[in-house]
Amino acid sequence: MMKPWTVLQELEADNSRLKKEAIIKRESDADNKDFFDGVCMALDGFRTFGVQKVPTSTKDGAGLSQDIFDLVVRQLEERTLTGNDMRDRIDELCATATKEEWNDWYRRILIKDLRCGMTHKTVNKFSKYKVPVFDCMLATDSAKHEKKMVGEMIVEPKLDGVRVIVICDVDKDEVTLFSRNGKELLNFPEINKQFDEMLDQMSESMVFDGE
């Protein structure tokens, strides 16, 4: 069984779409669960870790097991590991892992960017492992649909800003901001704070979509 970081290196090294698809199918047929578990952690927009900065490894440690990493990821998802404790624990993981393990695998999962030119679409189409799809409604240029532009309609200016989808989860007592591509946004603390103050007034979980 190929190590997950070795598979990722192979995907990153080849720009061919067909080659990437073949690699994904090969690993799926080989039942490389560790690889696809990590891929799903990184590509699933609904799984967030609350991590802003993840260090790069500069020297080899003894090696980090997937089980230990998975345990920490679970704590990050449940927000039972936060703040300075989170930072210190991630630093410990970085020091424990080899450079190859950390920089080419574990770190990329935590920053939710595999950097290998592969999306959830490739995984879902060419493997038995599936990644939940984070999707939002997007506008289409009316110039491509002129025949539909008849009758009365409402027109508004096109906003030029940052698309933000806010998920207010009353069960988890948590507010999370996402980009249109499902990447967690951590650079709008004031917006997050405003929605967090509204959370106690909500009787059910809600989603807000805006620019």
Positions of PLM-derived features:
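N-terminal nucleic-acid-engaging modules of covalent nucleotidyltransferase systems
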Residues: 1-211
